UniProtKB/Swiss-Prot annotation:
Family from the record: Belongs to the ABC transporter superfamily. HrtA family.
Gene: hrtA
Function of the molecule: Part of the ABC transporter complex hrt involved in hemin import. Responsible for energy coupling to the transport system.
Entry annotated with the keyword Cell inner membrane: no
Annotated binding of ATP, by residue: 39-46
Cell compartments where the protein resides: Cell membrane
Bilayer topology annotation: Peripheral membrane protein
Span of domain ABC transporter: 3-221
Protein name, per record: Putative hemin import ATP-binding protein HrtA
Amino acid sequence: MALQLKHITKTFGNGDAQTEVLKNINFSVNQGEFIILSGASGSGKSTLLNILGGLLSPSSGDVLYKGENLFSKEVDKTSLRLNDIGFIFQSSHLVPYLTVREQLMIVAKEAGIKRKEAKDKAQRLLNEIGLSHRLDVYPHLLSGGEKQRVAIMRAFMNEPKIILADEPTASLDADRATSVVQMIKAHVQTKNMIGIMITHDKRLFEYADRVIEIQDGKIEL
């Protein structure tokens, strides 16, 4: 089950003030594949990721998933974002008044997962990243690396089919950045997900199955 982009364009503005940010983007990503989107700031990477996540509509073109266009009227984009797509951002965006375990459980609650099941699953995921001793700790007591690991596990909580990561390692040192990318890739492969990550860090390219370079809104061949 691939995620396919066909002739995606995105234009902002009106009349003479229009700016074409994405220009005829075409590629597909298969299940179990982890790709990196790279390119200069302002090249259109984040706009493309927002389109893939259903947060922004393309001006033209199709994004096909499960054989359906994500932007057809029949597709429930709210349900899709909740159940099929996991987002990881540059900032962890943890809720300050929730403990580490609660950060994960609130996502499960929104998806209708029973509390006992959610609690057990949160425990397993946090054990996996070495934070079992931090279950009841609040975000202000966590290091930057710990916060980002919690954010990653939060994205995996509902077992999404697609993981979209926008510069998740930008604020981390080299060792922590490598650890985070290895963690994301491992989940993508073992759970047969589709993984797409934006990064400028060329040291991380070796962990991708493919690197897609975007320049001036176009894929650089």
